[in-house]
């Protein structure tokens, strides 16, 4: 425990909060060709690689991911949620923050149903998270 005198002389240091999705905190001014510190909730990017990855120890699966080059020039790894996808190289996608706990280095999610990404087919519950449209009512 510091004394009052020590606190008067030195003071408390502020804790630096590190962002969990740093690529969304950088912008790019293409006219001036400089990086800017403009945060955004989502960013657009182009897929450079689409593939599968195996998760960390207790889990076992083939998780779908895409390597995405964002409009600010940063390349990130993003998870493709849902069953089945239509992404391939050069697909334009929208990413949001949010890590995948069992995939190391994956800090972003691709938003389904936006830009080139199709929504999940035949999804009835939690549709908004997967870009699925409301199913048509069958006439009797």
Curated annotation (Swiss-Prot):
Q: Which residues carry this modification: 3-methylthioaspartic acid?
A: 102
A GO BP term here is: translation
Alphabetical list of PROSITE patterns matching this protein: RIBOSOMAL_S12
PANTHER family per the UniProt record, alphabetical: 30S RIBOSOMAL PROTEIN S12 FAMILY MEMBER (PTHR11652)
Give the species this sequence originates from: Geobacillus sp. (strain WCH70)
- State the UniProt keywords alphabetically: Methylation, Ribonucleoprotein, Ribosomal protein, RNA-binding, rRNA-binding, tRNA-binding
Known function:
With S4 and S5 plays an important role in translational accuracy. Interacts with and stabilizes bases of the 16S rRNA that are involved in tRNA selection in the A site and with the mRNA backbone. Located at the interface of the 30S and 50S subunits, it traverses the body of the 30S subunit contacting proteins on the other side and probably holding the rRNA structure together. The combined cluster of proteins S8, S12 and S17 appears to hold together the shoulder and platform of the 30S subunit.
Q: What is this protein called?
A: Small ribosomal subunit protein uS12
Q: Which family does it belong to?
A: Belongs to the universal ribosomal protein uS12 family.
The Swiss-Prot or TrEMBL record annotates one GO molecular function as: rRNA binding
User: Which is one Gene Ontology cellular component term of this protein?
Assistant: small ribosomal subunit
Domain of life, per lineage: Bacteria
């Amino acid at each position: 425990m510091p004394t009052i005198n020590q606190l008067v002389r030195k003071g408390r240091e502020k804790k630096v909060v590190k962002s969990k999705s740093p690529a969304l905190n950088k912008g790019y001014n293409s006219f001036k060709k400089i990086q800017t510190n403009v945060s955004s909730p989502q960013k657009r990017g182009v897929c450079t690689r689409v593939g599968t990855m195996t998760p960390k120890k207790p889990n076992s699966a083939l998780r779908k991911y895409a390597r995405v080059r964002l409009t600010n020039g940063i390349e990130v790894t993003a998870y493709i949620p849902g069953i089945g996808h239509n992404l391939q190289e050069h697909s334009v996608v929208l990413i949001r923050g949010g890590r995948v706990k069992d995939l190391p280095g994956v800090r972003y999610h691709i938003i389904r149903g936006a830009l080139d990404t199709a929504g999940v087919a035949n999804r009835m519950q939690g549709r908004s998270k997967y870009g699925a449209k409301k199913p048509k009512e069958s006439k009797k």
